[in-house]
Design a protein with these regions (language model features):
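Residue-level detector of conserved, well-ordered beta-strand and adjacent loop positions
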Residues: 33, 76, 85, 99, ...
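Zn2+-dependent peptidoglycan hydrolase active-site motif and core
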Residues: 43-91, 115-123
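Short glycine/threonine/proline-enriched tight-turn/helix- or strand-capping micro-motif at secondary-structure
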Residues: 8-44, 51-64, 70
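Short acidic/polar mixed-charge low-complexity motifs
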Residues: 38, 78-81, 131-132
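Short, well-structured beta-strand-loop connectors
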Residues: 39-51, 92-107
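Short, flexible loop/turn elements at secondary-structure junctions
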Residues: 34-36, 77, 88, 128
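Acidic, glycine-rich catalytic/binding loops that coordinate metals and/or anionic ligands
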Residues: 1-5, 90-102, 109, 117-161
Length: 161
C-alpha cells in the first residue's frame, strides 16, 4: 500500500477522523491536511469507478455552497471502493486502470473562509466492493450506512494514526 499524501506525520484533529460526531452529521471519512495542489497517489491498484462533484454548489443531494467546488474520484481495488475527495478535477476517466502509487489527482482548497483551521485536505472514504451510488451521508442518531466502511483500517497500515 502507498501513502496517498507523501507525509510522515498526520496531524488530523478529532473532527477530521472517521465517525466523529459533528454539529449536523457524523464524519464519513478521514481528512489528511496538506497544501492546496498537493499530489494525491493511489493507495492500491484498481479501476476508476466514479468521478463526481464532492463539495460546493454542484453537490447532490444537498449543495454545500459554503465550501469551494471540489471533485472526488473513486477507485475500486482489493480493499473495496476508495473515494479520494476534495481534489481538482482529475485527468483520469471512468474505467481507467490505476497502479498503486500512481499520481491520480491534486488536493484542492475546500474551505472558502479562513476560520483558523486548515483550508486544504484530502478527504478519504471507504465503501464495500461493488458499491456504486451517492456518497454516504451519516446523519446524527442514525446507524452507519451499510455501504460505508472505516477507512482508518487501511490508513493505520501506512501511517501512524
Amino acid at each position: 500500500m502507498t501513502k496517498p499524501i507523501k507525509t510522515e506525520v498526520i496531524n488530523t484533529p478529532p473532527h477530521g477522523r472517521f465517525g466523529f460526531v459533528r454539529k449536523f452529521d457524523i464524519h464519513t471519512g478521514f481528512d489528511i491536511y496538506c497544501s492546496d495542489g498537493e499530489p494525491v497517489f493511489a493507495i492500491e491498484d484498481g479501476i476508476v469507478t466514479d468521478i463526481s462533484h464532492f463539495t460546493g454548489e454542484y453537490t447532490t443531494p444537498v449543495p454545500t455552497p459554503w465550501w469551494e467546488n471540489t471533485m472526488a474520484i473513486a477507485i475500486e481495488g482489493k480493499s473495496g471502493v476508495i473515494l479520494y475527495g476534495e481534489i481538482y478535477e482529475p485527468s483520469l476517466r471512468i474505467g481507467d486502470k490505476i497502479s498503486e502509487g500512481q499520481h491520480i489527482a491534486n488536493v484542492k482548497r475546500v474551505l472558502k473562509n479562513d476560520k483558523g483551521l486548515p483550508m486544504s485536505m484530502l478527504h478519504i472514504e471507504l465503501y464495500i466492493h461493488g458499491y456504486r451510488g451517492d456518497w454516504a451521508v451519516w446523519n446524527i442518531e442514525e446507524e452507519k450506512p451499510n455501504e460505508l466502511c472505516n477507512i482508518e483500517t487501511i490508513l493505520s497500515k501506512i501511517y501512524k494514526l
